[in-house]
């Protein structure tokens, strides 16, 4: 039997069923017999219209369950999970990140009111009665106001006086006595009452020689809130102090005037000491000419607190972080990252070394403790190196210590081990 298409099979079955129904032409009226003849004549036209009206593929397409459920092709899911598209979505230009952050910060925020200390001082001066007479039964804690005079290290090589001297002054402000002027020669009995505030002056070097007739001078103090003020005195120069004295913490101050003279010592040439207060500097090169200083500040302030950030000239910027860890984080985040289509080249200045953009592996080496020990070693050995010359180390000794061997042949003795179970 030859292969028959589905359309022909349906057509033959339909024709056979109609032939069986109309097999007895004598039964029925005239209209039925006329209808048989007309049906036989128009059978060919009916099959053509039937073929046009019905197609099995149309019926399958209408009742397809996949269309109702919304089943997607598995290849589309694979394309969505492709790692290359994820990488393209995550890596973006730093300018896009700046723009998105600016859009997020367009919401108006209430300006934070920063209270000036001078306003508080004036308010406190205008109403001293509230502070002079504290309520009975309450204990007022001792508030300390410290003023530090910072001496620049650059002028440390020019001592003014051959005998450096130290001076410590402690002045007690007693609100119950309602006095603002105190003499330094005042007896201890006059200030035996409980102090509510305490002010400390710390000075070093030849400052004592400029204070002639200090006992007759008087110090005026105002009623102020607890406040720490750092004043840079460029006019004051002091002799260089050893590193051990420089880093030594100040001890408790007494109420007496202490004058301590030290014998002059010949100090070695002072090395530049990297203070943590200076921060960690990072320079950014290869910037687009349209990058401004505001862009630099907004870009790097995300990584941590900035000491300063400025545009040296178009294409080069300088950023100084307060903490070293923040500078390392910014270096790892923005080194060789594109800003306005140009990769940023970051150079990190740390521990006296410069880590360029092509040497990120030096970050791991610069933070190792061995580097710190090597940098601190010359400072400790300076005093001893002048008297004793450095000892020469034999390379055979180093080989023997490291590999238990040397250049020459060494006789090895067998080692016996006794193990008790």
Curated annotation (Swiss-Prot):
GO cellular component terms given for this protein: cytoplasm; cytoplasmic ribonucleoprotein granule; cytosol; nuclear speck; nucleoplasm; nucleus
Keyword annotations from UniProtKB, A to Z: Acetylation, Cytoplasm, Isopeptide bond, Methylation, mRNA transport, Nucleus, Phosphoprotein, RNA-binding, Translation regulation, Transport, Ubl conjugation
Alphabetized PANTHER family for the sequence: POLYMERASE DELTA-INTERACTING PROTEIN 3, RNA AND EXPORT FACTOR BINDING PROTEIN
Localization in the cell: Nucleus; Nucleus speckle; Cytoplasm
Modified residues (N-acetylalanine): 2
Domain RRM, first and last residues per copy: 280-351
PROSITE patterns assigned: RRM
SUPFAM superfamilies per record: RNA-binding domain, RBD
InterPro entries in the cross-refs: ALYREF_mRNA_export, Nucleotide-bd_a/b_plait_sf, PDIP3_RRM, RBD_domain_sf, RRM_dom
Matching Pfam families: RRM_1 (PF00076)
Chain positions with Omega-N-methylarginine modification: 33
Species per Swiss-Prot/TrEMBL record: Homo sapiens
Modified positions (Phosphoserine) in chain numbering: 5, 44, 127, 204, 215, 217, 244, 275, 383, 385
Name of this protein: Polymerase delta-interacting protein 3
A molecular function (GO) term: RNA binding
Role noted for this protein: Is involved in regulation of translation. Is preferentially associated with CBC-bound spliced mRNA-protein complexes during the pioneer round of mRNA translation. Contributes to enhanced translational efficiency of spliced over nonspliced mRNAs. Recruits activated ribosomal protein S6 kinase beta-1 I/RPS6KB1 to newly synthesized mRNA. Involved in nuclear mRNA export; probably mediated by association with the TREX complex.
Modified-residue entries (Phosphothreonine), positions: 140
Entry superkingdom: Eukaryota
Region spans: Disordered: 370-393
GO BP annotations listed: poly(A)+ mRNA export from nucleus; positive regulation of translation
Bias type Basic and acidic residues, positions: 370-379
Entry comment on modification after translation: Phosphorylated at Ser-383 and Ser-385 by RPS6KB1.
Lineage: Eukaryota, Metazoa, Chordata, Craniata, Vertebrata
Transmembrane segments: none
Cross-link (Glycyl lysine isopeptide (Lys-Gly) (interchain with G-Cter in SUMO2)): 200, 223, 248, 372, 418
Assembly notes: Interacts with POLD2. Interacts with NCBP1 and EIF4A3. Associates with the multiprotein exon junction complex (EJC). Interacts with RPS6KB1 (activated). Interacts with ERH. Interacts with THOC2, DDX39B and ZC3H11A; the interactions are ATP-dependent and indicative for an association with the TREX complex.
């Amino acid at each position: 039997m030859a292969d028959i298409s589905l359309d022909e099979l349906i057509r033959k079955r339909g024709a056979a069923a109609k032939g069986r129904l109309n097999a007895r032409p004598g039964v029925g009226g005239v209209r039925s017999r006329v209808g048989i003849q007309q049906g036989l004549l128009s059978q060919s036209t009916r099959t053509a219209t039937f073929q046009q009206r019905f197609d099995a593929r149309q019926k399958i397409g209408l009742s397809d369950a996949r269309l109702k459920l919304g089943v997607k092709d598995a290849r589309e899911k694979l394309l969505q999970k492709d790692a290359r598209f994820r990488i393209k979505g995550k890596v973006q230009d730093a300018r896009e990140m700046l723009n998105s952050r600016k859009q997020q910060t367009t919401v108006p925020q209430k300006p934070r009111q920063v209270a000036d200390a001078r306003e508080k001082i004036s308010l406190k001066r205008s109403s001293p009665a509230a502070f002079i007479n504290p309520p009975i039964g309450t204990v007022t804690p001792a508030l300390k106001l410290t003023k530090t005079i910072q001496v620049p290290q650059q002028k440390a090589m020019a001592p003014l006086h051959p005998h450096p001297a130290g001076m410590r002054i402690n002045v007690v402000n007693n609100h119950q006595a309602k006095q603002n002027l105190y003499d330094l020669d005042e007896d201890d009995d006059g200030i035996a009452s409980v102090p509510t505030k305490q002010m400390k002056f710390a000075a070093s070097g030849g400052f004592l020689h400029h204070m002639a007739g200090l006992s007759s001078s008087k110090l005026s103090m105002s009623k102020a809130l607890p406040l720490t003020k750092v004043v840079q005195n460029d006019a004051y120069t002091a002799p260089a102090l050893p590193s051990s004295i420089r880093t030594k913490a100040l001890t408790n101050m007494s109420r007496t005037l202490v004058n301590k003279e030290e014998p002059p010592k010949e100090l070695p040439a002072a090395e530049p000491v990297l203070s943590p207060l200076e921060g960690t500097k990072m320079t950014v090169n290869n910037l687009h000419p349209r990058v401004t200083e505001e862009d630099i500040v907004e870009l790097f302030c995300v990584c941590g607190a900035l000491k300063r950030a400025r545009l040296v000239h178009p294409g080069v910027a300088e950023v100084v972080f307060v903490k070293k860890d923040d500078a390392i984080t910014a270096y790892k985040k923005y080194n060789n990252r594109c800003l306005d289509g140009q990769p940023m080249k970051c150079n990190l200045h740390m521990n006296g070394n410069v880590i360029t953009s092509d040497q990120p592996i030096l970050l791991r080496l610069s933070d190792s403790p061995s580097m710190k020990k090597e940098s601190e070693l010359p400072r400790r050995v300076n005093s001893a190196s002048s008297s004793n010359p450095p000892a020469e180390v034999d390379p055979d000794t180093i080989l023997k210590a490291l590999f238990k061997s040397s250049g020459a042949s060494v006789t090895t003795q067998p080692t016996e081990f006794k193990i008790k179970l």
